[in-house]
From Swiss-Prot:
One of its GO terms (biological process) is killing of cells of another organism. The keyword Disulfide bond applies. The modification Serine amide is found at S74. This is Penaeidin-3m. It is found in: Cytoplasmic granule. It comes from Penaeus setiferus. The lineage of its organism: Eukaryota, Metazoa, Ecdysozoa, Arthropoda, Crustacea. The keyword Signal applies. One of its GO terms (molecular function) is chitin binding. Transmembrane segments: none annotated. Disulfide bonds join C44-C59, C48-C66, C60-C67.
């Protein structure tokens, strides 16, 4: 009888944890290390308006495609 009660308790506890997520010291989300975003090569083929300053600098240094105000790419 004790075995049945114990098994029922464990089964119900497992269902509760599975449905809601147990809140304990070992179940918190794992923090990921900061990773620098990689500028894709496709960003350099877009107009200068659609990319960030970092992407524009990267395109200019890597490919020689430099953005100029109101002119788009040159080079």
């Amino acid at each position: 009888m004790r075995l049945v009660v114990c098994l029922v308790f464990l089964a119900s506890f497992a269902l509760v944890c599975q449905g809601q997520g147990c809140k304990g010291p070992y179940t918190r989300p794992i923090l990921r290390p900061y990773v620098r975003p990689v500028v894709s090569y496709n960003a350099c083929t877009l107009s200068c308006r659609g990319i960030t300053t970092t992407q524009a600098r990267s395109c200019c240094t890597r490919l020689g495609r430099c953005c100029h105000v109101a002119k788009g790419y040159s080079g």
